[in-house]
Amino acid sequence: PNLGLVLSYSVPRVATPGVGGTAPETVNSPTQGNGLFNGSNTLFSQLTLKPSDNLKLGLAYARTYNSTGTGVSGNNGTNFANNPFSSAAGAGNRPTTADHYSLLASTNLSPNLILSGWGGYTQARRQDAAGKADIWEYALTLAAKDFGGKGNTLGFVAGMQPKLTSNSGDTAARVDAVSGLNFEAFYKYKVSDNLSITPGL
């Protein structure tokens, strides 16, 4: 489990900036490799813009430090994307920092049809030796609100899971040769004001 704090402030119809951070439960441990500044942590900021009633834009940045060098992509995507500098001999012993950049956009094609997309880029760096890795991901979603009844939503998602595209140092060979593509369809059915179910495939 992680502990976290998020602060945000909204300027109606214009922008919503926010900042926050998370750290594992070991943040309160005084032992080596733990604590707020010596253990794994995440600091992030985000800015949501609404240039018009039909368009929303989002910018996000996160700075992470992982003391073991694993889970760089939040345990999503390929093994290389999550463990860019790990190997059979050194897994779990390669502390890594990473800068994560994201761009999001959403527009109303009609009152009930929403098209959204986002892309992300991560640059990870080893802290115990030379090594830098580039990781990319993206997704596109289409959602139809009130489809089949008020409060229901039919949605489709297509995208690429986090993929390690380049690497350097003694793990330069750890690069994904193929992309992990993801396709989903779901239907959120509103049973009542307090209950909904979402089957998907």
For every predicted segment, state its role:
Residues 1, 45-49, 103-107, 140-144, ...:
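Residues on the lipid-exposed face of transmembrane beta-strands in outer-membrane beta-barrel proteins
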Residues 1-48, 181:
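Aromatic- and glycine-enriched pocket-lining scaffold segments that form the walls
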